[in-house]
């Protein structure tokens, strides 16, 4: 392909081999043999999309985040809640400051569990979740000196998704391996930030390819 059509043709041929050729067949077979859900159609029909990021503002700063196909909206949701407090007056990393940040994140993560999904397959009420009115209602669940021992109930952001889902259930947390995060800052102000848990014991190498499914992808059989 490179000889006949140059670099562009070579890249197309490489993509075809990965998504619909012999490499794709090997990947799909590995998933199938291990009880996974990935199919040949999933591979061949995949296309990268260009989309507008979510946008919000906090303290005069514009914030852009990925859409609800991942947990990107959690941060703007949490900041929308925190916009109702004077964190500067609370003092950086004081008990009050930390309490407010943690409780806001709990509320945002509760909505993530309830509402987030791929917009190509489910209607996510993102405009409501990021609206000041919704944040004001949810903010009432943050109480001074009192913390939710687990995730609080999700908010009522409309029935677009809610009508299709069962009521949330609560139970004892199950100890398990989870995301590892490392952040180090030295005395000169140099920072290192990494989330090294994507490749783990749950992401085996697919034989003959040198490739491993992501931790998210391997969840279809682990």
Positions of PLM-derived features:
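A short, polar/charged loop-to-alpha-helix boundary motif
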Residues: 201-218
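M16/insulysin-pitrilysin zinc metalloprotease superfamily fold
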Residues: 72-88
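Structural recognition of the beta-strand scaffold that forms the well-ordered cores
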Residues: 55-57, 62-65, 74, 183-184, ...
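Long, well-ordered, tryptophan-enriched scaffold segments
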Residues: 1-63, 68
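Internal maturation/activation junctions in enzymes
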Residues: 5-9, 24, 36, 84-197, ...
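Conserved catalytic alpha/beta cores of large enzymes that bind or transform nucleotide phosphates
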Residues: 102, 216, 221-222
């Amino acid at each position: 392909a490179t000889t006949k059509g140059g670099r562009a043709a070579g890249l197309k041929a490489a993509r075809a081999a990965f998504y619909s050729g012999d490499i794709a067949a090997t990947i799909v077979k590995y998933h199938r043999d291990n009880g996974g859900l990935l199919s040949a159609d999933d591979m061949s029909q995949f296309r990268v999309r260009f989309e507008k990021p979510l946008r919000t503002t906090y303290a005069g700063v514009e914030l852009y985040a990925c859409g609800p196909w991942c947990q990107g909206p959690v941060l703007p949701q949490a900041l929308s809640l925190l916009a109702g407090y004077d964190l500067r007056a609370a003092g950086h990393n004081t008990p009050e400051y930390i309490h407010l940040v943690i409780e806001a994140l709990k509320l945002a993560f509760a909505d993530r569990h309830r509402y987030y999904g791929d917009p190509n397959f489910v209607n996510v009420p993102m405009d409501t979740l990021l609206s000041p009115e919704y944040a004001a209602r949810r903010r009432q669940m943050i109480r001074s000196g009192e913390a939710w021992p687990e995730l609080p109930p999700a908010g009522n952001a409309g029935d677009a998704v809610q009508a299709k889902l069962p009521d949330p259930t609560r139970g004892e947390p199950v100890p398990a391996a989870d995301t590892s995060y490392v952040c180090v800052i030295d005395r000169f102000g140099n920072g290192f930030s990494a989330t090294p848990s994507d490749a783990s014991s749950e992401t085996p190498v697919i034989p003959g390819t040198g490739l491993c499914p992501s931790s998210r992808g391997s969840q279809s059989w682990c």
